[in-house]
Design a protein with these regions (language model features):
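A charged helix-plus-loop insertion that forms the helical arch/lid used to bind
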Residues: 1-7, 51-53
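Second-shell residues forming the walls of enzyme active-site clefts
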Residues: 54-210
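Glycine-rich, aromatic-flanked loop segments that form ligand/cofactor-binding clefts
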Residues: 12-39, 59-83
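Alpha-helix N-cap/helix-initiation motif
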Residues: 5-8, 12, 106, 175-176
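Acidic/polar active-site rim loop that often engages polyanionic ligands
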Residues: 1, 41-48
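Generic detector of intrinsically disordered, low-complexity, polar/charged segments
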Residues: 13, 17, 45, 50, ...
Length: 210
C-alpha cells in the first residue's frame, strides 16, 4: 500500500527490481509476491497494507510494476491469493473464510486484477484457502476446487503458468479437511506446486500419500 501511495508505478517497478536483485544475490529465485487482493473490506484482518489499494484498477496498475520489476531483477514472482482474499472478515491462517457474492461482483472486484496480471505476464498464481460459493458450491476452498483452478483459472482465464497453493498447514485446510487430504485434493484440482511450510514430518506424509 505504501508503494501505491507514492502515486508512481515506476517507483513500484524499481522497488521490485531492487528486491529481485537482492533476493537473487542471496540465492533466492522465487518471491511469493505480490498480493493482488483488493482491500475492499475494512474488517479484513490479514490483507490490509499487503494490498496496493481498495479498487481493482489501483491494484492492477501497481502490481504490474512489481511483477515486471521482480522478473527484471532476476526472480520469479506470483500473483496471490486467487480468486481474491480482499473481501473477507476472517484470516485463512486461522479458519476458513467465505466470500459469498455473485459471479458478476467477483468479476468486477476480485478477478479483475488477476486477469490484468495474466495479461502482464505473471509467471505464477497462488490459490486461496477460501470458499467461493458462486464459483464452486461443493464446499471446498479454491485451492481444492477443480472448478476454480482448472475450470476458471486455466480454462476461462487462459492462464498457462505455474499454479501454487498457499500453505496447506494453514487452519483453513488443516482444521477442516486435514493437510494431507488437502494436498491430494489440491493436486487433483490442478495445483502444480503444493506448499507445506512448517512441519517436515507432515511434508513427508503428504509426499507418501501423493
Amino acid at each position: 500500500m505504501a508503494l501505491a501511495a507514492t502515486g508512481d508505478p515506476e517507483t513500484t517497478y524499481l522497488a521490485g527490481k531492487l528486491t529481485g536483485e537482492e533476493l537473487r544475490s542471496l540465492g533466492v529465485n522465487f518471491n511469493l509476491a505480490p498480493s493482488v487482493d483488493v482491500n475492499c473490506n475494512p474488517a479484513n484482518p490479514i490483507i490490509g497494507v499487503r494490498s496496493y489499494g481498495d479498487t481493482p484498477a489501483t491494484v492492477a496498475k501497481y502490481a504490474a510494476g512489481m511483477i515486471r520489476g521482480l522478473q527484471d531483477g532476476g526472480v520469479l514472482c506470483l500473483a496471490k491469493h486467487f480468486p481474491g482474499h480482499g473481501d473477507t472478515s476472517l484470516d485463512s491462517h486461522l479458519t476458513l473464510p467465505c466470500v459469498d457474492k455473485p459471479r458478476d461482483e467477483l468479476e468486477r472486484m476480485e478477478l479483475a486484477p488477476f486477469r490484468a496480471a495474466i495479461a502482464d505476464g505473471v509467471p505464477a498464481i497462488m490459490t486461496a484457502h477460501i470458499l467461493f460459493p458462486a464459483l464452486d458450491d461443493s464446499g471446498v476452498p479454491a485451492t481444492m476446487s477443480r472448478r476454480i483452478v482448472t475450470g476458471l483459472l486455466r480454462g476461462e482465464m487462459g492462464f498457462t503458468g505455474l499454479v501454487t497453493s498457499d500453505c496447506m498447514e494453514m487452519q483453513a485446510v488443516q482444521k477442516f479437511f486435514g493437510s494431507v487430504n488437502g494436498v491430494l485434493a489440491a493436486m487433483n484440482a490442478g495445483v502444480d506446486l503444493v506448499l507445506l511450510s512448517h512441519t517436515t514430518l507432515l511434508s513427508g506424509e503428504a509426499a507418501k500419500a501423493a
